[in-house]
């Protein structure tokens, strides 16, 4: 404990405050790691550090992370609970987009399950009106007919709910969220379960014939911590014969793009009208570990790269993150009666 786990937890947090404290999907992993170490060792200080971040007197509240986004939220909060409150809307939409929500759901739900078991008084799955469970439902609805997530913001194409993080999310949400039989339908498609109490619950539910199809529907998900920063609309015709994805939300933190009115159109999972996403050497270790190219900012994030109107030959908000993050689109009407 003293020679490995505590030094490791300190390195993740105290030695790296500008990353541990930020509101970002990467930080959720750090929060969860420190918190899980604290839960196992019975170290309340580590658990508190994970939940609320570390003091930031020596860090500029306006400082940015290596992705160009602000480290703290507007109120200067940090830690796991801040990452639960700030990026998620009341509907469970994650402002960075479904690709990054998929990545973050593992630490969110695994640490939450640990808190649920070891700190029941925190009632973590009821935080923000049960937003973690809503997030699983929202994320599954943000996939096409093939189960692949819509590539919003910097989202990589081809990532689906077959990934390990979604197996965990579906299993845990089923166990602690009232055993929604629709989740069993997704679990059947995934074809695997966790080797724990959540996985056993899912396996038994499928064995007992409780599974129901997860019928993806037209949805209009709000964006922003209080749901007032625009949103994301998905209009589906029939059995996903046609699916329109219309983004009119907030910036999307550091992974967001300078477009507030972009759209994509799918036919049975195939792109008919695509919306440009990212420029990245995915999984090519020799290329900076598979990082983003500079063209991700100079081209892919700009409004001209999207299915959005460009005025005066310039990106929305001049392509400036500080300005774009202060603004969002407004919803005037939404009607899916014919879908």
Go through each PLM region and give its residues.
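Generic hydrophobic alpha-helical segments
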Residues: 41, 57, 115, 146, ...
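Generic secondary-structure boundary/loop-capping signal
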Residues: 91, 149, 306-308
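Aromatic-lined, polymer-binding surfaces characteristic
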Residues: 1-133, 137, 143
């Amino acid at each position: 404990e003293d020679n490995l786990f505590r030094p490791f937890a300190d390195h993740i947090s105290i030695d790296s405050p500008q990353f541990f404290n930020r509101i970002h999907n990467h930080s959720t992993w750090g929060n969860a790691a420190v918190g899980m170490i604290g839960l196992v060792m019975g170290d309340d200080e580590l658990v508190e550090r994970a939940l609320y971040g570390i003091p930031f007197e020596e860090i500029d509240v306006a400082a940015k992370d290596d992705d160009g986004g602000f480290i703290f939220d507007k109120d200067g909060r940090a830690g796991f609970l801040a990452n639960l409150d700030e990026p998620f809307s009341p509907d469970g939409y994650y402002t960075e987009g479904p690709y990054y929500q998929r990545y973050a759901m593992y630490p969110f739900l695994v640490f939450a399950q640990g808190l649920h078991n070891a700190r029941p008084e925190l009632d973590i799955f009821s935080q923000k009106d049960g937003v973690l469970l809503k997030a699983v439902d929202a994320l599954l609805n943000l996939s096409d007919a093939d189960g692949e997530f819509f590539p919003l913001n910097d989202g990589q194409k081809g990532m689906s709910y077959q990934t390990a993080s979604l197996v965990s999310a579906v299993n845990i949400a089923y166990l602690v969220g009232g055993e929604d039989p629709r989740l069993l339908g997704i679990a059947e498609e995934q074809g695997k379960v966790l080797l724990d109490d959540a996985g056993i619950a899912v396996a038994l539910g499928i064995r007992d014939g409780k599974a129901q199809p997860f019928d993806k529907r037209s949805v209009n998900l709000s964006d922003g911590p209080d749901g007032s920063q625009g949103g994301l609309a998905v209009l589906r015709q029939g059995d996903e014969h046609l699916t329109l994805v219309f983004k009119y939300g907030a910036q999307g933190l550091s992974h967001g793009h300078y477009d507030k009115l972009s759209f994509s159109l799918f036919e049975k999972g195939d792109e008919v009208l695509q919306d440009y996403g990212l420029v990245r050497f995915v999984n090519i270790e020799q290329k900076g570990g598979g990082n983003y190219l500079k063209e991700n900012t100079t081209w892919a994030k700009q409004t001209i790269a999207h299915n959005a109107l460009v005025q005066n030959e310039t990106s929305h908000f001049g392509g400036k993150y500080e300005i774009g993050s202060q603004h969002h689109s407004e919803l005037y009407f939404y009607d899916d009666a014919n879908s």
